[in-house]
Every structure is written in C-alpha cells, then in structure tokens.
Amino acid sequence: MKGELSLHICGCRGSRSVFGPEFTEFGGQTTCFVLKKANYALVLDCGTGLDNARDLLAGCSAVDVVVTHWHYDHVMGLMDWSVFPAGAKLRFFVSSDAYNLSFDALSQLFRHPFWPVDPTLRVVRQPVKWECPVSLRPGVKVTFLPAPHPDGSSVLDLSVFDKHICVLCDFEHNREFPEEILHNCDLLLYDGMYTDDEYPAHVNWGHSTWQEGCRLANRVEPARLLITHHEPRRTDSQLRALEQEAKKLFPAAAFARAGMKITF
C-alpha cells in the first residue's frame, strides 16, 4: 500500500468532554485516534473526538475500528454514524470479553427514549482472544491485552505497516503488566490523567500518571512517548507546564493535542 502512515489525534481528553477557551490547544473531546495510510483507516476508540475524524475518513474505502472498552468517553462518538463513509467496508474489533457485551451495551446506550437512532454494528463475528495477534488485513495486526481498569479495558499492541505502536489508555500502572511487549516501540501512547501527587486519592480508578509514563518509557525506550487521557479540568497552560516537566524525565515525551499529526 503506497503512501505515508500517519497518526491523527482526534480526541485526547479523559472521562468527559470539556469546553471553553482554556481547553482549545489540547482539546476537550474524548479519546479517538486514527491511523491512516492511503485509502485505509484504523480508528482506535470512538469518543466524542470521532467527529474530528470525518474529513480523514471521507476518502477511505476500508475502515477498521478497534474499541478498547465500552465506557461513555470511548463510544459516544457513535451517536453519529455519518462520520463513516457510506461506501466503505466497515469492521469493528473488540476483545473477547467486550465482544459479548457489544450489542447489549450499545443497544442500551443508543435506544429510545434517549436517542432516536439505533446503530447497526457490522462487528466481526469472531471475538478477539486476549494476547493473540489478529491480522486485520495485510500489514495490520493487533493484540489485545487486559488492562487494569474498572469494568475492564484493553491495551493495544499494534503492528501497522511495519510500525510498532502501543496504546495504554485507560490503564492503571501495574507491576504485573508484561512490559517486554513495549520495548523499542515506535510510539507509546500512555494514560497520564493524574500527577503522582494526585494519584493516591484515585487508586483503583483505572488511570495512571504522566510521571509513571515517563518512568515506563525510560525502561522500555520507545522512539516517542505521547501522554493522553488528560484530566478533564486540566487547562492548556497547566498541560503545557506538565509537558515541560515530562521532557525533563524523558526527552522524547509530548502531551497529545487534538489535531496533532504524527508521521512515521
């Protein structure tokens, strides 16, 4: 497949959307990332940031969607299915645990009298087993690993056209996690919702700290570290200041911003 591979940050706010002039640089819409090459797109989660993917998906003939879990901030973008090209081949991939909940969860979320549109999912009819690489198409593989998070979530270990990308979003740091899968990845996206000082009040909430992300990066040495899932009330100025502190701990660190594009 010709063309460059790029990652687009369509939403990187954690837990809920926020609005206002103090949230314009990093964005207030919730998790949605898009990997794109030529006329193919791989969508990672469908938070409210999915609407920002509309133009990216417009020319795609094939779209794969990976859903880490069914919490609102990762699926509310599915309120408007017109974001997906009408003629594109659309497939959804979820973990074996989430698969069993997929139809029930979405039918409960998008149903009368709360929402007038009943979305029809074209979900792959085979659940994806934990820790078993699945080929989505030639050159694209994903491995789901269980993430420490209330109700469960997934770490994504992705091989996309020879690039190794790991997504630890909605992830609480855990010594038992197999860090070896992350070694020397091209990009590590990490849940940095809290600071180390804030974390003790949020143990078992299913999220980590940007400092833990930097410590992990120093152990596994990714080419780039991107901190995401920003705390809802964290302003642009606060995030900029934390980003500078993160660079002191791991020079290749940055904080995700809505509209950011990373080319591999």
Language-model segments: which ranges?
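Cap/insert and terminal regions of metallo-dependent hydrolase folds
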Residues: 172-259
